[in-house]
């Protein structure tokens, strides 16, 4: 039979390493941070931002955070940034949220933690080439107990919240 290598604690296998990585974007962003749009409204799904919500603010922050949300309940964020990947390989992403959240990298959905729910953690993995990749995170808070954490790990990177130094502002179109 075929042998399979399993790398602890990343849970990445030799089969995962055979996945063709998404190519890096040919961009050179200069400024670090995350761009956001902030919405208020009654949401049960991230698709409801445009239909049930009102855009109240936009700006930039150092990392993905909901701590400065003006409302306690019934709000949402749409975050966009470039993620600087230090080495080609398979990366695990972990999204812990209350309520719903979705994570896309280079337009590909990596984690679906959507819907109105108490704090829940979901993960996904994706192979990425060294360089910059578009990261798009959608989050909403329905009511009671808002939480949002996005973590990353790989064979050579312990699980951690994505460091500020890996995040760059999207380029103006």
Where are these regions (language model features)?
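Gly/His-enriched, cation/cofactor- and phosphate-binding structural elements
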Residues: 1
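Extracellular/secretory pathway-exposed regions associated with glycan biology
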Residues: 4-92, 96-173
């Amino acid at each position: 039979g075929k042998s399979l290598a399993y790398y602890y604690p990343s849970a990445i296998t030799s089969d995962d390493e055979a996945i063709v990585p998404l190519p890096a974007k040919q961009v050179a962003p200069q400024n670090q941070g995350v761009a956001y749009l902030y919405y208020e409204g009654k949401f049960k799904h991230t698709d409801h931002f445009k239909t049930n919500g009102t855009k109240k603010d936009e700006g930039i922050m150092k990392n993905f955070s909901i701590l400065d949300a003006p409302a306690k309940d019934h709000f949402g964020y749409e975050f966009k940034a470039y993620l600087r990947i230090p080495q080609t390989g398979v990366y695990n992403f972990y999204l812990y949220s209350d309520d719903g959240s979705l994570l896309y990298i280079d337009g590909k959905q990596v984690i679906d933690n959507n819907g109105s729910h108490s704090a829940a953690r979901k993960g996904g993995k994706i192979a990425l080439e060294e360089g910059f990749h578009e990261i798009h995170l959608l989050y909403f808070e329905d009511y009671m107990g808002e939480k949002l954490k996005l973590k990353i790990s790989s064979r050579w990177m312990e699980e951690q919240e994505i460091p500020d130094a890996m995040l760059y502002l999207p380029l103006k179109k």
